[in-house]
Amino acid sequence: MSITAAQVNELRKITGAGLMDCKKALTETNGDLEQAVDYLRKKGLAAASKKAGRAATEGAVGSYIHAGGKIGVLVEVNCETDFVARNDNFQAFVKDIAMHIAAASPQYVRREEVPAELLEREKEIYRAKARETGKPENIIEKIIEGQINKFYAEICLMEQNFVKDPDKTVQQFLNETISSIGENMSVRRFARFVLGEGLEKKESDFAAEVAAAAGL
């Protein structure tokens, strides 16, 4: 069935969950609002949203160095209190995120950070390809929307499939951790370094090496 914007907005008001999460929840539950709320709660998304407005100014800068020193990552993850910043679960989360960044090579933390000019360029490429199919404009726009969401999932950390559990996104992993720890958390920024990046060298699959080192 078709999910309307009004349904999505209503679910967002109730749960405070993200737009795409609400849309997916309604799709999975055939538009049943009550079931969609339960769906989000089971995923940890609704519970996390209740904490989202609280300031997260403590935290830690974590690091990950790939075996052999070929890839290095620094990532800043914020939480509300210094007590939680020293918590083993929080520290494990920071380490897992740093390892994920090393393996998946995201370019941005979230979709809002993607430059408008880059996004528009991608849309034009997708639009040109879609028009070659001869489909109506309304169908073409839906195709473009789907392609852009895939693009976000490739380059935005929070929308990537988590390398240690590909059945969930990094955002879902974050939400689950927020629910278990009981404090708001946020991945603020990261930097990823590759040995010899920009220099002419023999190609190798660093992502596969990182995954292998993590036992994935």
UniProtKB/Swiss-Prot annotation:
GO terms for cellular component: cytoplasm. The keyword Protein biosynthesis applies. Its main location: cytoplasm. Residues 81-84 are annotated as: Involved in Mg(2+) ion dislocation from EF-Tu. GO terms for biological process: translational elongation. Keywords: Cytoplasm, Elongation factor, Protein biosynthesis. InterPro entries: EF-Ts_dimer_sf (IPR036402), Transl_elong_EFTs/EF1B (IPR001816), Transl_elong_EFTs/EF1B_dimer (IPR014039), Transl_elong_Ts_CS (IPR018101), UBA-like_sf (IPR009060). GO terms for molecular function: translation elongation factor activity. The keyword Cytoplasm applies. It holds the Pfam family EF_TS. It is found in: Cytoplasm. Belongs to the EF-Ts family. PANTHER family: ELONGATION FACTOR TS, ELONGATION FACTOR TS, MITOCHONDRIAL. Associates with the EF-Tu.GDP complex and induces the exchange of GDP to GTP. It remains bound to the aminoacyl-tRNA.EF-Tu.GTP complex up to the GTP hydrolysis stage on the ribosome. This is Elongation factor Ts. The lineage of its organism: Bacteria, Pseudomonadati, Thermodesulfobacteriota, Desulfuromonadia, Geobacterales.
